[in-house]
Amino acid sequence: MNSLTKEEFMKIYNEGENLTDKPIFIDFYATWWGPCKMFEQVLDKVTPEYTDKINLYKVNIEEEPEIAGLFRIMSVPNTVTISKSGDVFSMVGALNEETLKYFLEGLISKK
């Protein structure tokens, strides 16, 4: 997963870059928070098989508070997805491997 800066995010969002190509998955996290550390292990295990189907990003809320603010992130871990058509969905909490795979497959199949 690639770290996402404010500049990169604004380019993707404003120019629509990647929105018609692949859906976007953003993991908002804090390095010091236990649930984020646990979810990171799940992400590291599951997401490599999706790199060709989904644009995968992570955002450290302490380093990029403006991106977190745009999505009104109040707690972490928090996952935000943007479908190919531009629909935004947010989910709070860590997922297990099975649920994450189900979630990612649903994101891929959404038009």
Where does each model-flagged region fall?
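Acidic phosphotransfer microenvironment of two-component signaling modules
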Residues: 7-10, 65-66, 98
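N-terminal targeting signals for export/organelle localization
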Residues: 1-4, 109-111
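Non-catalytic, surface beta->alpha helical segment in thiol-disulfide oxidoreductase systems
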Residues: 75, 80-111
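Thiol-based oxidoreductase modules, predominantly thioredoxin-like and allied folds used
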Residues: 3-4, 28, 40-43, 47, ...
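Mid-chain, well-packed structural core segment of small domains
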Residues: 65-74
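Short pre-active-site segment immediately N-terminal to redox-active cysteine/selenocysteine motifs
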Residues: 21-22, 28-32, 75
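A short beta-strand-turn-helix
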Residues: 3-23
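Short, thiol/selenol-centered motifs that function as redox-active sites or metal-ligating centers
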Residues: 32-39
